């Protein structure tokens, strides 16, 4: 079990407790919040590993690196044999549409499948909507649902290059309308650049934006959340655009290369 909010975040404890009955559970998570770090890894500095106590008294590995570092450490021997499954979350806030390319939660799961380990990413909206610390969350439904998905993710018949991206709406479990298998929608942010401090030639900026538009078309993850449904989206790490390849097949790339060589 890992996350990007940090080893002491409430969501990872809830997820760990939900999957505890399934077998031996190891928690390997960042020491501090590493949200929106995507697939960043540590390559120049040593990774510091410390054992810390979680809220239920069990021990976890706290890592100085990123969520992807956590998965790599687990797969490469920190816990002995590689894990049978990686479950990442439960994130404080949704990871829908465009968010998945930024998300450390989703990246950790993708790293799992890239290493041949089935994986699930889990995210939860705050009650009433919103994300981040200081808000109220109910992780019970989304984490129990993720635990039920673990045997399916591990099934030999399921493609090993695919993760389940699970998102829970910001409602109490009794208000859930069900669950839906979805595709990614679009969540475009209206970003602004704010100058917060200026001292001589040094300036401090903050980039921030609220979602400007949502793709609420039927079948999208955003539409499911809007309908108070749990959303489950299969994702994979192959970013190839097959339609683009078909279009580019008409390009004479050899001719382009020849012209480049002749120009030199």
Question: Language-model features: where?
Answer:
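Electrostatically charged, flexible surface regions
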Residues: 137-264
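Short, Asp-centered acidic motifs that coordinate Mg2+ and/or phosphate
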Residues: 85
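Glycine-rich phosphate/pyrophosphate-binding loops
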Residues: 113-138
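A cross-family phosphate/adenosyl-ligand binding-site feature
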Residues: 10-77, 81-82
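Short beta-strand segments
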Residues: 2, 28-30, 88-91, 121-123, ...
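Glycine/threonine-rich flexible loop motifs
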Residues: 94-103
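Alpha-helix C-terminal capping segments
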Residues: 74-80, 107-118
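Short glycine-rich anion-binding loops that position phosphate/pyrophosphate groups of nucleotides
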Residues: 5, 33, 66-67, 91-94, ...
């Amino acid at each position: 079990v890992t996350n990007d909010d940090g080893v002491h975040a409430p969501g990872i404890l809830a997820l760990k407790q939900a999957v505890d009955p399934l077998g031996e559970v190891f928690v390997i998570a960042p020491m501090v919040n590493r949200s929106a770090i995507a697939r960043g890894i540590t390559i120049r500095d040593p990774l510091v590993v410390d054992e810390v106590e979680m809220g239920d008294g069990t021990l976890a590995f706290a890592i100085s690196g990123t969520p992807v570092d956590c998965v790599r450490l687990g797969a490469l021997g920190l816990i002995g044999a590689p894990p049978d499954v990686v479950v990442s979350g439960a994130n404080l806030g949704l990871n829908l549409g465009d968010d998945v390319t930024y998300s450390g939660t989703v990246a950790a799961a993708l790293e799992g499948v890239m290493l041949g380990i089935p994986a699930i990413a889990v995210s939860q909206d705050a009650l009433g909507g919103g994300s981040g610390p200081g808000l109220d969350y109910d992780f019970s439904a989304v984490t129990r649902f993720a635990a039920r998905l673990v045997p399916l993710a591990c099934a030999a018949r399921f493609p090993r290059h695919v993760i389940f991206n699970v998102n829970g709406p910001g409602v109490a479990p009794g208000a859930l309308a069900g669950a839906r298998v979805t595709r990614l929608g679009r969540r475009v942010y209206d970003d602004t650049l704010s100058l917060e401090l200026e001292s001589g030639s040094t300036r401090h900026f903050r980039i921030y934006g609220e979602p400007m538009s949502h793709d609420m078309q039927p079948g999208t993850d955003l539409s499911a959340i809007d309908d108070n449904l749990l959303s489950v989206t299969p994702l994979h790490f192959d970013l190839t655009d097959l339609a683009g390849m078909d279009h580019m097949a008409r390009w004479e790339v050899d001719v382009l290369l020849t012209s480049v060589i002749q120009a030199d």
